[in-house]
Amino acid sequence: MQIIHTIRELRAWRKNAGKVAFVPTMGNLHEGHLALVREAKKRADNVVVSIFVNRLQFGQGEDFDKYPRTLQQDADKLEAEGVAVVFAPDEKELYPNVEQRYSVEPPNLQNELCGKFRPGHFLGVATVVSKLFNIVAPDVACFGKKDYQQLAVIKGLTEDLNFDVEIVPVDTGRAEDGLALSSRNQYLSAAERDEAPRLYRELKAVAESLAQGSLDYAGLEKRAVQSLTEYGWVVDYVEIRRADTLEVARAGDKKLVVLAAARLGTTRLIDNLEIKLP
């Protein structure tokens, strides 16, 4: 396995790499990331994993400075999975002209759901993913469904900007108690970790009500928020949306997703659950 730090070197490698699958990450890899890598391996001759903590997608007061940088441990895990290349550029490599930086702005979704609470986040995501697609030139790229809104943004930019990349969604990895795997879970105290699976349980409760025919979307959302709040969560949102577009769900929609973001202590957790109605 190679660890490549420059765009020029990666492009030289890419010329003879055959079909390439790509998994972009910020490092600090866990089993959820490795599931993306395993899916990528099924779909290509070679897998490239990028590791880059992207300052653009962190807001003021967020955890950019304390986000764990664990390149050597990550590289060891990826080598064991048979990854061909780890692309680990520094900030100057990806953003050499900070004062003249062009960006990619998602038109519809960046101010809703997580975008409402993290201004500029999805602009940062869309910009770095566009740059990485141009650099890596993958045939396939794998993204986890845990970041459901991010996945929707990436599907949109891939289509609108004519990237010749197949986007492969991968199911959310979970701990045995249902908590979605996330690099930020390590910020949780022991007591918070015990409480954290409640977020997924509330999503399942909403999904069960929808499956039983409830059309009181606002009521279901409100009850989930109240329940989480009673247990000490600070809730950004619980919302039921159309799964394919993330538009506000309407009666008669069959493919839905319930999404949530909430803080437990100082840690912001997100999760979602897809629902297909008969």
UniProtKB/Swiss-Prot annotation:
(R)-pantoate binds at residues 57, 150. One of its GO terms (molecular function) is pantoate-beta-alanine ligase activity. It catalyses: (R)-pantoate + beta-alanine + ATP = (R)-pantothenate + AMP + diphosphate + H(+). It comes from the Bacteria. Pathway: Cofactor biosynthesis; (R)-pantothenate biosynthesis; (R)-pantothenate from (R)-pantoate and beta-alanine: step 1/1. Its EC number is 6.3.2.1. Keywords: ATP-binding, Cytoplasm, Ligase, Nucleotide-binding, Pantothenate biosynthesis. Beta-alanine binds at residue 57. The active site is at residue 33. One of its GO terms (biological process) is pantothenate biosynthetic process. InterPro entries: Cyt_trans-like, Pantoate_ligase, Pantoate_ligase_C, Rossmann-like_a/b/a_fold. Homodimer. Belongs to the pantothenate synthetase family. Catalyzes the condensation of pantoate with beta-alanine in an ATP-dependent reaction via a pantoyl-adenylate intermediate. The reaction proceeds by a bi uni uni bi ping pong mechanism. This is Pantothenate synthetase. It comes from Neisseria meningitidis serogroup C / serotype 2a (strain ATCC 700532 / DSM 15464 / FAM18). The lineage of its organism: Bacteria, Pseudomonadati, Pseudomonadota, Betaproteobacteria, Neisseriales.
